[in-house]
């Protein structure tokens, strides 16, 4: 009887990912699995931004596509424990800050006895994540992408095994091409172990059960500044410790970095720049963090907090993929070398996203996923990394694309600057959001836009206009002569380009 029901399961499944013999009294881990074999045109290892987009694009181009993802939900770090939940918390904390700090009074809105319901804040975050990850699963069904839940391990140039938690083979997929889109993971800090309650990673920081009184952030890059802002707005006293002499991470323009630091200091942030963390230890309910000056190690200090966030970067997740057996080496940072078509040294195996060179950004991975699949289908493969934007979701937001002044000086490129402050922008005035500016860097001889940097409440949206202009090789004059709706924040972008081309803007 059991055998009959088993074969019934096999014959009624169009493409089973595994067949399991159910034996009463045994746990799920003890049940015997029978690996299936699947034939495919494309296997994508990883269901994050790069992987899920590549999977859908492959299916849309007529490829029989299988995505191997070990998580309980699709979307990778970005949707589950990164971009999306952090933006939800940033949004909620911003609203709380406006009400609690009395910022609404100037608009004639009086709010008394403002209280924080942290559990409801977290519920909003969870609901957002659930909706978006579920949306990807629906897109997979719509586009006929098969999701095999497991850890992908490449066994040959045209074969991948999906492994279960115990290392057993769930499915074997034979395929024409393979895309590695395994993303990245939190870089550990030597000597510190995450308990995700007091000593926390970016993942644990998204789910704290109470607001810390004193909150120390190791690393004042994009992630550290954003997550620090969440808890600072909710009432924590925040201190950021940064090894470098500036904040904001790699690629940020020096002038922009200085201005956002001033804004954060005004919001009661404390900064320890050019400072190295030597040790951190628990003492009762507190954490004692020992630091020293980078240039003068004799200058030492001890700081106390009740929560310590470690944000010292991320590293590619490229272990246990079977790369070594195929002759695919990784560089000193664990990244997979690829050519300009995103092929590894094995022509049928490609890699995209955080596990290769370039900034670890979801939108960069998405673009690479699309063009890699188009290349496999015979199309052209091109991406201009100078046109990949970056955003820090503070308030006001920070956005940039292309070269910074420091880059241009280092490369010996002659340039001109056009700037326009939001203090002189009509929409910024109406919204009482006048902090910030737009800065254009254009070639001194050709007027071609080389870089755009901005600080404003909607920089994350507005920077995309700059990306479009640069992608099509626009000059400052091109943008300056393009009509912009009034009153809008985007007018500042036009005015800054006027300043770059004509030497001065109209409204300042």
What is each model feature region?
Residues 55, 59, 228, 232-233:
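Gly/Ala-rich phosphate-binding loop of Rossmann-like dinucleotide-binding domains
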Residues 45-50, 54, 59-71, 84, ...:
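Flexible, glycine-rich terminal cap/loop adjacent to redox cofactors
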Residues 36-50, 211-221:
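Beta1/beta-strand and adjacent pyrophosphate-binding region of the FAD-binding site
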Residues 24-38:
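N-terminal mitochondrial targeting presequences
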Residues 6, 15-19, 23, 38-40, ...:
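Glycine-rich flavin
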Residues 41, 62-64, 213-214, 348, ...:
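Residues that mark the start of a beta-strand
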């Amino acid at each position: 009887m059991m055998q009959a029901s088993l074969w019934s399961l096999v014959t009624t499944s169009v493409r089973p990912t595994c067949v399991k013999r159910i034996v009463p009294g045994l746990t799920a881990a003890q049940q015997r699995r029978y690996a299936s074999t699947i034939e495919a045109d494309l296997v994508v290892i990883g269901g994050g931004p790069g992987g899920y987009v590549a999977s859908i694009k492959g299916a849309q181009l007529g490829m029989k596509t299988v995505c191997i993802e070990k998580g309980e939900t699709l979307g990778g770090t970005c949707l589950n424990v990164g971009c999306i939940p952090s933006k939800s918390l940033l949004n909620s904390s911003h609203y709380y800050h406006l009400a609690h700090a009395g910022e609404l009074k100037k608009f004639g809105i009086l709010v008394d006895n403002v209280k924080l319901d942290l559990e409801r804040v977290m519920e909003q975050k969870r609901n957002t994540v659930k909706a978006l990850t579920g949306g990807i699963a629906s897109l997979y069904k719509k586009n006929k992408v098969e999701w095999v839940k497991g850890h992908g391990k490449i066994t040959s140039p045209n074969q991948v095994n999906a492994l279960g938690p115990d290392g057993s083979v769930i499915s074997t997929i034979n395929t024409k091409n393979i895309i590695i889109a395994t993303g990245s993971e939190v870089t550990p800090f030597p000597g510190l172990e995450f308990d995700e309650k007091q000593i926390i990673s970016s993942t644990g920081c998204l789910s704290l059960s109470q607001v810390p009184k004193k909150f120390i952030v190791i690393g004042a890059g994009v992630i550290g500044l954003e997550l620090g802002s969440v808890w600072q707005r909710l009432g924590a006293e925040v201190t950021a410790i940064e090894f470098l002499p500036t904040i904001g991470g790699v690629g940020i323009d020096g002038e922009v970095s200085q201005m956002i630091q001033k804004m954060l200091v005004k919001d009661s942030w404390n900064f320890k720049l050019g400072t190295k963390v030597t040790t951190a230890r628990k003492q009762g309910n507190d954490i004692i963090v020992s630091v020293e000056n980078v240039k003068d190690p004799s200058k030492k200090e001890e700081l106390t907090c009740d929560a310590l966030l470690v944000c010292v970067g991320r590293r590619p997740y490229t272990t246990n993929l079977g790369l070594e057996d195929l002759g695919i080496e990784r560089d000193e940072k664990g990244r997979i070398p690829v050519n300009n078509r995103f092929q590894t040294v094995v022509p049928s195996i490609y890699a995209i996203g955080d596990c290769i060179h370039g900034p670890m950004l979801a939108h960069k991975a998405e673009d690479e996923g699309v063009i890699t699949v188009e290349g496999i289908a015979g199309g052209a493969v091109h991406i201009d990394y100078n046109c990949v934007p970056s955003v820090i979701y503070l308030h006001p937001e920070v956005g940039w694309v292309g070269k910074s002044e420091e880059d241009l000086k280092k490369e010996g490129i002659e340039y001109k600057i056009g700037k326009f402050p939001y203090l002189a922008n009509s929409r910024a005035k109406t919204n009482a959001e006048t902090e910030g500016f737009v800065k254009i860097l254009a070639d001194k001889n050709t007027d071609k836009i080389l870089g755009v940097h901005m600080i404003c409440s909607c920089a994350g949206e507005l920077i995309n206009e700059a990306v479009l202009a640069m992608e099509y090789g626009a000059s400052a004059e091109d943008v300056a002569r393009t009509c912009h709706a009034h009153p809008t924040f985007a007018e500042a972008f036009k005015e800054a380009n006027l300043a770059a081309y004509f030497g001065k803007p109209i409204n300042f």
